[in-house]
């Protein structure tokens, strides 16, 4: 009897973890955008006016729970919780719930960045949060939850990143480290996440997951409610989980400890795609992209060119500040069938601590748009760059097809097909790409969605004529604005 019960428990845990890899997208949609630090009302409008019509699958939103108020309002104050009240600079609970409903109604799922590892760091005296809650972080006193010192791990500093105890039980950059093995802490975290599920979210990005024991996270995830069917989720749907685990391949705490619980952020993807499109690796090597590079299996990998953290660091990672290679890397990211794709939508920053665009009263301001739909008032909005949102459409058009017809020049000019539905060419050399290439597409004329759009049957950019054999003449000059060309069956003239 015990053996049977144990077996059933294992089977249930396994089925739940598999379900937590499902992002619950509508139809053929398959790209998430991180609208970093946007207000809830603005996200609702963006879902209705842009993301839904352009075929985006979901939005990762900034942390929703009350946070400490820091001088100058740096972005990272959102990662210093003070309670689980849903009031931040992005809005209150009513506005959040309205946003989730409106986005779900147009087929755009919401994934919340959640902080389960810690509360805020030290603060002199009494700290006040964005909902007016008081706390004394130095004493580990957070009455808004409530948490007291007994709910935290003993105070210690991470000095050795190869020491599992330090990584998972000491304080990450001074943030008060919760004890997730405590029944009380578990109950409060589950209560918080379940409330968000009731409001209609599709899942969670789990911040600092590697700093929590995988067995504690497994307990928390498996205890969560199913998704809310009132928001269009099928019965018994589990929340999509993707976990921040920074693993460069030599970490004591490995990404592999978390990959069966949900998807894992594949940071090596970000680093290597940056290396390639900065010219440090020939693009020809990308033919084996994905698991051939030692990355996680596709369905377990959350992939990105940059995120809100590493875009602020020095190194190979690309960001909006290098627009041509960034757009090329993003085009490859969205065209190559590997991973669960997320694109970044940033605000301009000059240093690591730059706050989001704000007014004189330190209130976040709404993005404004020019006549072409681009953001103009401190918001970068990469997701509104034509070269990026067009590739979201490309990814939708070629869903469930494989790579065929790979071509390269032995260096950094490459092209490939996605079945007979799409074609991508890239030129990262200092000389032109001018070649008859197999597009694998049916005969006809196609609009290059990178340089223009198909409007009323006419292409506003380049077009390529494909012959009966599937070949077309492809030209990408070394000094072209974008360095990439993309064709697909939904952009046939």
Curated annotation (Swiss-Prot):
Major location category of this protein: secreted
Report a single Gene Ontology molecular function.
Answer: alpha-amylase activity
Q: Which residues form the active site?
A: 207 (nucleophile), 244 (proton donor)
Q: Keyword Disulfide bond, does the record have it? A: yes
Q: Name one GO biological process term.
A: carbohydrate metabolic process
Disulfide bond entries: 47-103, 156-170, 375-381, 417-440, 447-459
Q: Per its Swiss-Prot or TrEMBL entry, what cofactor is needed?
A: Ca(2+); chloride
Annotated keywords: Calcium, Carbohydrate metabolism, Chloride, Disulfide bond, Glycosidase, Hydrolase, Metal-binding, Pyrrolidone carboxylic acid, Secreted, Signal
- Site positions (Transition state stabilizer): 309
Q: Which residues form the signal peptide?
A: 1-19
Q: Which domain of life is it from?
A: Eukaryota
What does the cofactor section's free text say about binding?
A: Binds 1 Ca(2+) ion per subunit. Binds 1 Cl(-) ion per subunit.
Recorded GO cellular component terms are: extracellular region
Q: What is this protein called?
A: Alpha-amylase-related protein
| Taxonomic lineage | Eukaryota, Metazoa, Ecdysozoa, Arthropoda, Hexapoda
Q: Which gene encodes it?
A: Amyrel
